[in-house]
Amino acid sequence: MKLRLLRCLRQQPAKPAAVMTHKEDQYPVSLDHHVLKDMAKGVRDTTVKILLLGTAESGKTTIIKQMRILHINGFTDDERREKIPEIYQNIHESILQLVGQMGVLGIDFGSCTSERSADYILSLPGSAPEYMNEEYCDHVTTLWNDVGIRACYDRSNEFPLLDSAKYFLDNFVRISDAEYIPSTEDILHSRKITTGISQITFRVPIPKSMGGGEQQFQMYDVGGQRDQRNKWIQVFEGIQAVLFLISCSEFDQNLREDPSQNRLQEALKLFRAVWQNRFLASAGLIVFLNKYDIMERKIRAGKHIVDYFPEYEDFCKRPQQDNCFGESDWTKMFIKQKLVDITQEPFKRHSRNQVDLGTSERECYYHFTVATDTRCIRDVFCDVQKMILSENVSSMGLF
């Protein structure tokens, strides 16, 4: 199964999620229906194990949530209510961080009222209030509407801030309502640090053209912080595919745990370690270049990857068949090429966890994704699933 998935990754061309199609006639249907059904049963009887890897805040847990939405009927009202403290904490941490950075960045508040609201927020503990009382809500609303706080937010790449800060603060009036129940979108944007290992099991329908029935998947999520990565090896055994998430938007940010380290550089370094790890050498590797929507917003706001990766300038000078690309397109291609270069470089085995000397024949399958976009993730995962099933049939020499 592992090698079959690997071959299928090499055979299928990488396409952006936005242009994917998933018509059943993409796959051959000339075999006898009963033969297809028997072969599909062989696939169904094997649980496909997928491991999510990547740095912290790259979107791994959001993918787990999407699998639940798409394949396990989403969240009950009780489960939604259980997310309220997490969302409150996201809001509290965001406004607290913004207020705390005003002095550091030398930004003034727009009014004396905002200054008083800032003093109130700074007097509170780091944990969010259990209930959104009127006084707290008034101060948060005042601060988020302050021109100084907005200027601070525009420089949020200079300090740690949740990607979802703007989303939650923009929706604060709705969220602070006493009858609030989190929406699916709220849950997808919520953030809680992953520690340890979590797992989700779900079943996905198999197309009728491939025998019908269902395929079972197990997906594992592990913490992406540096101090959590030593736990990863615990789930390497039996993994048939690795989904490696890398955040395209983090080219101008530094790590929370190491402010001297660029986040994208850290992600590339981690990808190299995963690529060279001998325990994952037979697993298919799929890369989700995630959060490209945030990356595009940053570029429109005047941020440029060349300020953090000087080699980008030479990359853009390379001859291309189509020179009509905008800066966002070039940036996406540049980040992807960084990953491709890693997969093509020869390397020596420096530790027992690395594969042997030589140039690996493995190839990756790349997708640009927005993990909070259910439609995008549905299309991407549908395509990956069909590849797995199609290759299992074709590997038997019948196509």
From Swiss-Prot:
GO process terms (BP): adenylate cyclase-activating dopamine receptor signaling pathway; mesoderm development; positive regulation of hemocyte proliferation; regulation of filopodium assembly; sensory perception of chemical stimulus
Record: residues binding Mg(2+)? T194
**Which Gene Ontology molecular-function terms are recorded?**
G protein-coupled receptor binding; G-protein beta/gamma-subunit complex binding; GTP binding; GTPase activity; metal ion binding
Under CDD domains, the record lists:
G-alpha
Q: Where does GTP bind?
A: 54-61, 188-194, 221-225, 290-293, 371
PROSITE patterns referenced in this protein's UniProt entry, alphabetically: G_ALPHA
Region: G3 motif, residue numbers: 217-226
Distribution of this protein across tissues and organs: During embryogenesis, expressed primarily in the developing gut and transiently in the amnioserosa.
Write the record's keywords in alphabetical order, separated by commas. Answer: GTP-binding, Magnesium, Metal-binding, Nucleotide-binding, Transducer
| GO CC list | cytoplasm; heterotrimeric G-protein complex
Ranges where the record places region G2 motif = 186-194
Q: Name one Pfam family in it.
A: G-alpha
Chain segments carrying region G1 motif: 49-62
Every copy of the G-alpha domain together lies at: 46-399
User: Residue ranges of region G4 motif?
Assistant: 286-293
Ranges for the region named G5 motif are 369-374
Function statement: Guanine nucleotide-binding proteins (G proteins) are involved as modulators or transducers in various transmembrane signaling systems.
Instruction: Quote the subunit structure annotation.
Output: G proteins are composed of 3 units; alpha, beta and gamma. The alpha chain contains the guanine nucleotide binding site.
The similarity annotation says:
Belongs to the G-alpha family.
Q: What is this protein called?
A: Guanine nucleotide-binding protein G(f) subunit alpha
